[in-house]
Design a protein with these regions (language model features):
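Glycine-rich loop(s) and the adjacent beta-strand/alpha-helix scaffold that form part
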Residues: 1-14, 137-138, 142, 195-203, ...
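A glycine-rich dinucleotide-binding beta-alpha-beta segment and adjacent secondary-structure elements
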Residues: 105, 117-181, 211-224, 349-403, ...
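Glycine-rich phosphate/pyrophosphate-binding beta-alpha loops
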Residues: 179-187, 243-245
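Extended, charge-enriched "interface" segments that sit outside catalytic cores
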Residues: 241, 258-427, 431-434
Length: 435
């Protein structure tokens, strides 16, 4: 059957901004430099609202400690594991008893509401304890709250019982996505929902499934981690979980996913054409830089003015771009032909210039990571599901045999990522497969 277990989540108190003396807090302004994953349409920047910082103190800690016996996290009511990276305020006090203060961040919930999210003050304690503790903070002495912090416990389903399409291995045609798979976070849930929704639709019309590899998207990394390794705590996606981070850049999300989306019918023709125009423009810039000759006598005075080492011999423009202090923008100011090459198409100059420069400046790193990914793809092509009776495969380690039997991986690459399955176990399987 479908295996279930429990995890927990905890939320912070919501404060009414009316009556909060922001002059007693440190302002944290919003971003001023904005990037986007989609370059289509008008680049609209929403009004940035500041956040505010304050700190707990010894009196706050004493008040909270007096209520520990009433905290479900510490009186046995909630025993399951919560998110590692956003512990409750009571957990901070217990884990770090030597700390006299902890930072709190007052964050607006929106432009048209007085409700503010007190990040850092998640709690499962009774409301009166939370309120008394807040009032010991000078900036929140007169604070009123909309809702106290709270903790919940919830069921999740073992994600190792899912295929990479997020279809259940147990019940055909049933797809799982989001918190029920043991993840925490909006983007994590949204990414799974996208993949599960696509595959549910494909399943209904009898088409083959849609899956993403670890070198294609962070969604691919997340789903592979869930289905291969499982979870014993709420799973949060971090860039550090991806071994192919250089291939999963902000500037190349369209390069990785637009054509796949168009083939699936979830991206319209104008988006596809938008990407093709960009791809061709990037190619033209790279070709121009790879073939454009630079004469040292002409360029050296200009390089010295930019604070970089002069050339000892002539080179191609692409070689200059590899230098740390040089980029297409400052080089275009001293090389008129380059400036002209960057102007087409004029309405997309910034995004295309950035993408072309990254591909040239980091070419060696990108190609090296691509080769590593391609080697792993060869293992992805070796299907092993149903080809071994793991309980009788005594040539591999006991732990590896048990893990393989429980997870039943689809491919040899997936098997290699299962904790407890060693490289020697993979080699044994390769030999048995005649590879």
């Amino acid at each position: 059957g479908v295996n279930t277990a429990k995890l927990s989540a905890i939320a912070p108190v919501r404060v009414d901004k009316n009556g909060v003396p922001f002059t007693a807090m440190e302002e944290q302004p919003g971003d001023s430099d904005f990037h986007q994953f989609s370059y289509m349409g008008e680049h609209r920047v929403l009004k940035q609202l500041p956040c505010w910082t304050c700190y707990t103190n010894k009196k706050v800690h004493e008040t909270l400690k007096s209520g520990l016996a009433d905290s479900p996290l510490y009186n046995g009511q909630i025993q399951s594991t919560g998110p590692r990276y956003c512990p409750s305020i009571e957990t901070k006090l217990v884990t770090f008893p030597d700390k006299d203060q902890h930072p709190l961040f007052l964050e607006p919930e929106g432009e048209d509401t007085n409700e503010m999210y007190l990040n850092g003050f998640s709690s499962s304690m009774p409301m009166d304890i939370q309120l008394n503790a807040l009032h010991e903070i000078p900036a929140l002495r007169d604070a009123k709250i909309y809702r106290p912090g709270y903790a919940i416990e919830y069921d999740y389903f073992d994600p190792t019982q899912l295929k990479h399409s997020l279809e259940s291995k147990i019940i055909k045609g049933l797809f799982f996505a989001g918190q029920v798979n043991g993840t925490t976070g909006y983007e994590e849930a949204g990414g799974q929902g996208t993949v599960a929704g696509i595959n549910a639709a494909l399943h209904c019309v009898g088409d083959k499934t849609f899956e993403m590899n670890r070198d294609e998207s962070y969604i691919g990394v997340l789903i592979d981690d869930l289905t291969t390794k499982g979870v014993d705590e709420p799973y949060r996606m971090f860039t550090s979980r991806a071994e192919y981070r250089i291939l999963l850049r902000q500037d190349d999300a369209d390069a990785r996913l637009t054509e796949k989306a168009y083939e699936l019918g979830i991206a319209k023709r104008d988006r596809y054409d938008w990407w093709i125009e960009k791809k061709e423009a990037i190619g033209r810039i790279i070709e121009f830089c790879a073939n454009y000759p630079i004469k040292k006598d002409e360029i050296n005075p200009k390089l010295e003015a930019l604070g970089t080492t002069p050339l000892r011999a002539g080179c191609k423009l692409i070689d200059l771009i590899a230098r740390p202090h040089l980029n297409l923008t400052n080089l275009s100011e001293i090389i008129p032909d380059l400036k002209a090459a960057l102007e087409t198409p004029a309405n997309r100059k910034e995004e295309i210039t950035e993408a072309a420069e990254i591909k040239m400046k980091y070419k060696g790193y990108i190609e090296r990571e691509r080769l590593i990914a391609e080697k792993m793809h060869r293992l992805e092509d070796i299907k092993i599901k149903g080809r071994f009776n793991y309980s009788e495969l005594h040539e591999i380690s006991t732990e590896g045999r048990q893990k393989l039997e429980r997870i039943d991986p689809e491919t040899l690459a997936q098997a290699s990522r299962i904790p407890g399955v060693s490289p020697s176990d993979i080699n044994v399987m390769l030999v048995l497969l005649g590879r």
